[in-house]
Curated annotation (Swiss-Prot):
Chlorophyll a B1 binds at H654. This is Photosystem I P700 chlorophyll a apoprotein A2. Phylloquinone binds at W671. P700 is a chlorophyll a/chlorophyll a' dimer, A0 is one or more chlorophyll a, A1 is one or both phylloquinones and FX is a shared 4Fe-4S iron-sulfur center. It is a multi-pass membrane protein. It is an enzyme of class 1 (oxidoreductase). The chain crosses the membrane at residues 46-69, 135-158, 175-199, 273-291, 330-353, 369-395, 417-439, 517-535, 575-596, 643-665, 707-727. NCBIfam families: psaB. The gene is psaB. It comes from Populus trichocarpa. The keyword Hydrolase does not apply. GO terms for biological process: photosynthesis. PANTHER family: OUTER MEMBRANE PROTEIN, OMPA-RELATED, PHOTOSYSTEM I P700 CHLOROPHYLL A APOPROTEIN A1-RELATED. Belongs to the PsaA/PsaB family.
Length: 734
């Protein structure tokens, strides 16, 4: 008999029902569970798939460059970045007739186009690209890298080129390679690009392959580097009247510490960023030489961990046993990587708007809103994934004998204290925050707004003042003209910082009040509850008082039958599933807050946010309802406008989201009966009954239906908010 899907599990391939298909898809990437898997093949498969991932990323970015060069208006946009709308690509087949064609023909295009809200135009402009030819060359180069990556993936699956398990487990070499080779060298290379191409480009000088060996990035060349007079590279920076992309007001400095923003572009100084990347390169190049490999010098990570026994015996045997535990568990390593990447992605969201790195991006409000929201949602999914793999580690890879009385074992030993403290924090935050909001709602409803409970966030205001914000009148540290830090800051480091933090036209340290205090605590509630669910899922993954043998049931199980009542919904997977809803909920509050505060800032009526954000009705009426009106008007009796595509996506997002509940609220029995009835009807319908199936149709398992429901809920939720965000922002600011 021919091999049926899935080839990696012969047991599943012989399943006579449609379960074969869904379980096959669900376990396709769970390499550990496949037939005939060895540790060696497991590592090699994952290694090869990384190359495939890189190939897809390079192909995707190549496509961005190619479509903008082919169908965009990059060269026109470069002439006037503030008033020309950047085009992402053409719309091939605009439906709905002539009104649609007219509505979507913009940005100086000849036909219907999509506007880019990704910030790529600002990014490419900042790093020195100026023409469509530049974009095409970039696209071809990335296409080449994509092909090389695919070749690399194929090569490392060939017997001669397969790395051994010992190579994969050589932690010191990998750390050195990634720290020095990946971060260090690439940061140094990026500094080189900024100094040799981007900074001259910002001063109106085009440096390309044909002249980059002739153009000195700095008048004195490498002289100051070799004579130790490095400060010469910081002298004569661009002036505050510098026009970006021209020589007017330009200086000659290449590595500076100016601080603040370029007055015209409202983005960080390119020379500051070059300096930053050089410093990062220096640090990482050193860090990549710290671990012992073939040369017998440097640290052994195992020795470091073994030696690290905290004083007083309070953490038992400290980090003994951790090296082998982590180095032999791919799930532990993936959990650590995802936790780090999740935090970094969220930090990217926070810093992209407050410290914009790309020229003119701060004035493109829709792009700012889209990038913030995008990075926060990505961060949420990555962070929940970190806990999922942490839980799988405890179920599949954790060895109690190997970790006796070390920090990992002690986490499990006092998990009740950890979980109950998190529970207490969540309850406290939830009841108090909701109590304040509801009290204020009632006061507004009764016509006595002066009886609201409004709490000034004085500690946060004090922290902002310490960083130099003067409007609160705290007169402390950098906001005090008498402090040594203030005086040093004027000359030695970041003289532009204090101007930037007290300037009202950027998003640096926004002024905060009672509305911010409340929403901050609502977000804290969401973060703590999400963390509670995830931490409990991981710490109880091996077993709990209710179900001591839980680890024998694996990561995801629906229940342990009727004989052990109450074992439903307690698998580690169920914790992940619940946590994703809370994660989405929390990021909803975060993005609502960010967006509403910024809309009022950009429109110059911050009082609307300040007055309406202290009670729930204010959020519902003055943020959600007020800003969705343009969206709902995408189609109206007078035809359609350029927001109509977002109006459609808003409706479609709600549809997908609502479909999620069909899977989340009805379970297997209902679907099984429905499927059997439909199959009966099919088999008795002429013509239709000519179509037969080999697999007996059965309903999804409870766990699978939950996954499908969760996927629809998440995708619909994000689609709906994306349409709302882009339409309400672009509708106001063009």
């Amino acid at each position: 008999m021919a091999l049926r899907f899935p080839r990696f599990s012969q047991g599943l391939a012989q399943d006579p029902t449609t379960r074969r298909i869904w379980f096959g898809i669900a376990t396709a990437h769970d390499f550990e569970s496949h037939d005939d898997i060895t540790e060696e093949r497991l590592y090699q498969n994952i290694f090869a798939s990384h190359f495939g991932q890189l190939a897809i990323i390079f192909l995707w970015t190549s496509g961005n460059l190619f479509h903008v060069a082919w169908q965009g208006n990059f060269e026109t946009w470069v002439q006037d970045p503030l008033h020309v709308r950047p085009i992402a690509h053409a719309i091939w087949d605009p439906h709905f007739g002539q009104p649609a064609v007219e509505a979507f023909t913009r940005g100086g295009a000849l036909g219907p186009v999509n506007i880019a809200y990704s910030g790529v135009y600002q990014w490419w402009y900042t790093i020195g690209l100026r023409t469509n030819e530049d974009l095409y060359i970039g696209a071809l180069f990335l296409l080449f890298l994509s092909a090389v990556s695919l070749l690399g993936g194929w090569l490392h699956l060939q017997p001669k080129w397969k790395p051994s398990v010992s190579w994969f487990k050589n932690a010191e070499s990998r750390l050195n390679h990634h720290l020095s080779g990946l971060f260090g060298v690439s940061s140094l290379a990026w500094t080189g690009h900024l100094v040799h191409v981007a900074i001259p480009g910002s001063r109106g000088e085009s440096v390309r392959w044909n002249n980059f060996l002739d153009v000195l990035p700095h008048p004195q060349g490498l002289g100051p580097l070799f004579t130790g007079q490095w400060n010469l590279y910081a002298q004569n920076p661009d002036s505050s009247s510098h026009l970006f992309g021209t020589s007017q007001g330009a200086g000659t400095a290449i590595l500076t510490l100016l601080g603040g923003f370029h007055p015209q572009t409202q983005s960080l100084w390119l020379t500051d960023m070059a300096h930053h990347h050089l410093a990062i390169a220096f640090l990482f190049l050193i860090a990549g030489h710290m671990y012992r490999t073939n040369f017998g010098i440097g640290h052994s990570i195992k020795d470091l961990l073994e030696a690290h026994i905290p004083p007083g015996g309070r953490l038992g045997r400290g980090h003994k046993g951790l090296y082998d535990t982590i180095n032999n568990s791919l799930h532990f390593q993936l959990g650590l990587a995802l936790a780090s990447l999740g935090v970094i992605t969220s930090l990217v969201a926070q810093h992209m708007y407050s410290l914009p790195a790309y020229a003119f991006i701060a004035q493109d409000f829709t792009t700012q809103a889209a990038l913030y929201t995008h990075h926060q949602y990505i961060a949420g999914f990555i962070m929940t994934g970190a806990f999922a793999h942490g839980a799988i580690f405890f179920i599949r890879d954790y060895n109690p004998e190997q970790n006796e009385d070390n920090v990992l074992a002690r986490m499990l030993d006092h998990k009740e204290a950890i979980i109950s403290h998190l529970s207490w924090a969540s309850l406290f935050l939830g009841f108090h925050t909701l109590g304040l909001y509801v009290h204020n709602d009632v006061m507004l409803a009764f016509g006595t707004p002066e009886k609201q409970i409004l709490i000034e966030p004085i500690f946060a205001q004090w922290i902002q003042s310490a960083h130099g914000k003067t409007s609160y009148g705290f007169d402390v540290l950098l906001s005090s003209t008498n402090s040594p830090a203030f005086n040093a800051g004027r000359s030695i480091w970041l003289p532009g910082w204090l101007n930037a933090i007290n300037e009202n036209s950027n998003s640096l340290f926004l002024t905060i009040g009672p509305g911010d205090f409340l929403v901050h605590h609502a977000i804290a509630l969401g973060l703590h509850t999400t963390t509670l669910i995830l931490v409990k899922g991981a710490l109880d993954a091996r077993g709990s008082k209710l179900m001591p043998d839980k680890k024998d049931f694996g990561y995801s199980f629906p229940c342990d039958g009727p004989g052990r009542g109450g074992t439903c919904d307690i698998s580690a997977w169920d914790a992940f599933y619940l946590a994703v809803f809370w994660m989405l909920n929390t990021i909803g509050w975060v993005t609502f807050y960010w967006h509403w505060k910024h809309i009022t800032l950009w429109q110059g009526n911050v009082s609307q946010f300040n007055e309406s954000s202290t009670y729930l009705m204010g959020w519902l009426r003055d943020y959600l309802w007020l800003n969705s009106s343009q969206l709902i008007n995408g189609y109206n009796p007078f035809g359609m406008n350029s927001l109509s595509v977002w109006a459609w996506m808003f409706l479609f997002g709600h549809l997908v989201w609502a479909t999620g509940f069909m899977f989340l609220i009805s379970w297997r029995g209902y679907w099984q009966e429905l499927i059997e009835t439909l199959a009966w009807a099919h088999e008795r319908t002429p013509l239709a009954n000519l179509i037969r199936w080999r697999d007996k149709p059965v309903a999804l398992s409870i766990v699978q239906a939950r996954l499908v429901g969760l996927a629809h809920f998440s995708v619909g939720y994000i689609f709906t908010y994306a349409a709302f965000l882009i339409a309400s922002t672009s509708g106001k600011f063009g």
